[in-house]
Amino acid sequence: MRKKIIATVIGTSALAAVTWTNADAATTYKVKSGDSLWSIANKYNMSVAKLKSLNNLTSNVIFPNQSLKVSGSTSSSTSSNTSTGSTYTVKSGDTLSGIAAKYGTTYQKIMSLNGLSNFNIYPGQKLKVSGAASSSSSNTSGNTSSGSTTTYTVKSGDSLSAIAAKYGTTYQKIMSLNGLTNFNIYPGQKLKVSGKASTGGSGSSSTGSAGYKTPVFNHSNLYDWGQCTWHVFNKRAQIGKGISTYWWNANNWDTAAAADGYTIDRKATVGSILQSDMGYYGHVAFVESVNANGSITISEMNYSASPGIVTYRTIPASQVSSYVYIH
């Protein structure tokens, strides 16, 4: 009997040792599609604030396959949050508008300083936040000027708002110059960036939204990664019409936007936000084009595909007015 008791004690001690080792080893978590900081924090019985502190996160944006510390001491911020003089080292979750707000500048200025042609940045990247603009010799090869008209050849990763910022104009002006009715551009495409507008505006009237009230926010994207709200926030930032990051679930967006001073109606325009109260959380999408037959084309996430995947859908003319639009 005595021997059995001793064996039981030893076995229990060994089990405890094994359990401790496994708990100590489980200090990181690999993000899966659909995860959010809240769900991960809840899984490990910690607060979102603690999880963000452990990983030096400045926003709620996370990415699939990203490794997050879920236990241990807070990461030293000296290596990842470096800001020496006029340069800044990008951290996970950063956006150009967020960095610009931190340094009292604009995202267009940062793009110009670093020769950026799109909004894509990555952790560890060093960005100039003050000083002289980067040499644009590498970009001039795609630009031609003939008389009073200047053209630009689109490169991979370009957006209309980025091109507009580069030439000190607006994306609406470029759309008008080239007779564009949506934001879709492709590498190799030649765009007029100055001169006279193209004739035959067969559908460009959809961009005529001068009467709309459209405040602009320079917030970081705090919406859950891959959701419809996350996608629309990014799309609006890309066209220079940033929205608030505090509108919460999609079914609250029309009320929150109206409170912030945006025009809300049932008329779709290119670049407006389609909003619906369908489902438990509601849904939002980005209006890519208003078509000649009265239908509209929208882009969205987490509607007919998994979170993080952009899909496109055409809303028939007969259904367009059944949705609310934020301008």
Swiss-Prot record:
SMART domains: LysM. SUPFAM superfamilies: Cysteine proteinases, LysM domain. Residues 27-70, 86-129, 150-193 form the LysM domain. One of its GO terms (molecular function) is N-acetylmuramoyl-L-alanine amidase activity. Residues 68-89 are annotated as: Disordered. Keywords: Antimicrobial, Bacteriolytic enzyme, Cell cycle, Cell division, Cell wall biogenesis/degradation, Hydrolase, Repeat, Secreted, Septation, Signal, Virulence. Its EC number is 3.5.1.28. It is found in: Secreted; Cell surface. Residues 71-87 have a biased composition (Low complexity). This is N-acetylmuramoyl-L-alanine amidase sle1. It comes from Staphylococcus saprophyticus subsp. saprophyticus (strain ATCC 15305 / DSM 20229 / NCIMB 8711 / NCTC 7292 / S-41).
